[in-house]
């Protein structure tokens, strides 16, 4: 791994490093993630589509990779930036090194970068376009061409690009030491899950709570969903700008009229908000990490959450029937709402973590409670 690599940002900043992945080039929005672990889950999170991820923890790759920690069918991050790749990896579950994993998944990555300097730059100026090029012939001019071609995340409807193309069933539950992934004996609730870029661990979290899931493509109509006669509807995470997802917004509006319990996270939270007339905005400082403090306004408690989003809901545009339930303690941005006249709730972060804590797993329990109440009514 002696191939030189180049990282260039839209503001003209240039970083020289070493290629540790697939040889080639990658462009996208450069962001930073503060998670100490979970690099494989981050790489395979579809919400990172068209984004180059900087990991702030200095040593990445210590535990290798394995098939069980993948959150989707492939790597979706456009590229990876790290400080140091260890020469050796060690873990009882490891089957492949991070380097080999990146090469096999054709993912461009760069190491030997001053990630502290890069993170401070992104923290001061905000997320911006960037490009990684590998090889001795990589030039700043070529990188600038790639950055210009990428443009911005604003206006990009990426959910339909990462979504499944066919409906499928899911029953597999969460991982247990010594057992692997466990499927519960009883799953009394039928949930239709919209795949806007869904992570497998949120499906497992719901399955472990008694849900049999039918996962549908992002552009599935409300009529087709209701024809499946679900007990509830789940709206997944996903990448890109939520406003161009008009198909999702229209479907949510019709589903809310049906009275079915609905729960959304991440992009799903934003689509619910847009469906009730609120507005979203591009964040200058996006949230990416597994240590974000959020306050539950009902209980007053602080929960530590996993976050991954570059757009947020403008709290000032919420209608009267939307009650704010959670707010970020980093920047006071809106983190959760529920409707006062319908069994609809949503959260901006990731209850399933992967990586990160599961402090807000109780939100999934509340969704289960709404379905139980609806079935008993």
Swiss-Prot record:
Molecular function in Gene Ontology: ATP binding; carbamoyl-phosphate synthase (glutamine-hydrolyzing) activity; glutaminase activity
EC numbers on record: 6.3.5.5
GO terms classed as biological process: 'de novo' pyrimidine nucleobase biosynthetic process; 'de novo' UMP biosynthetic process; glutamine metabolic process; L-arginine biosynthetic process
Residue span, Glutamine amidotransferase type-1 domain: 190-377
Recorded family membership: Belongs to the CarA family.
Protein name: Carbamoyl phosphate synthase small chain
Pathway info: Amino-acid biosynthesis; L-arginine biosynthesis; carbamoyl phosphate from bicarbonate: step 1/1; Pyrimidine metabolism; UMP biosynthesis via de novo pathway; (S)-dihydroorotate from bicarbonate: step 1/3
PANTHER family listed in its UniProt record: CARBAMOYL-PHOSPHATE SYNTHASE SMALL CHAIN, MULTIFUNCTIONAL TRYPTOPHAN BIOSYNTHESIS PROTEIN-RELATED
Subunit structure comment from the entry: Composed of two chains; the small (or glutamine) chain promotes the hydrolysis of glutamine to ammonia, which is used by the large (or ammonia) chain to synthesize carbamoyl phosphate. Tetramer of heterodimers (alpha,beta)4.
Pfam families xrefs: CPSase_sm_chain, GATase
Biological function: Small subunit of the glutamine-dependent carbamoyl phosphate synthetase (CPSase). CPSase catalyzes the formation of carbamoyl phosphate from the ammonia moiety of glutamine, carbonate, and phosphate donated by ATP, constituting the first step of 2 biosynthetic pathways, one leading to arginine and/or urea and the other to pyrimidine nucleotides. The small subunit (glutamine amidotransferase) binds and cleaves glutamine to supply the large subunit with the substrate ammonia.
PROSITE patterns per record: GATASE_TYPE_1 (PS51273)
Region span, CPSase: 1-186
Active-site residues, as the UniProt record annotates them: 266, 350, 352
Gene name linked to the record: carA
Catalyzed chemical reaction(s): hydrogencarbonate + L-glutamine + 2 ATP + H2O = carbamoyl phosphate + L-glutamate + 2 ADP + phosphate + 2 H(+)
NCBIfam families: CPSaseIIsmall (TIGR01368), PRK12838.1 (NF009475)
Keywords: Amino-acid biosynthesis, Arginine biosynthesis, ATP-binding, Glutamine amidotransferase, Ligase, Nucleotide-binding, Pyrimidine biosynthesis
Binding-site residues, L-glutamine: 47, 238, 240, 267, 270, 308, 310-311
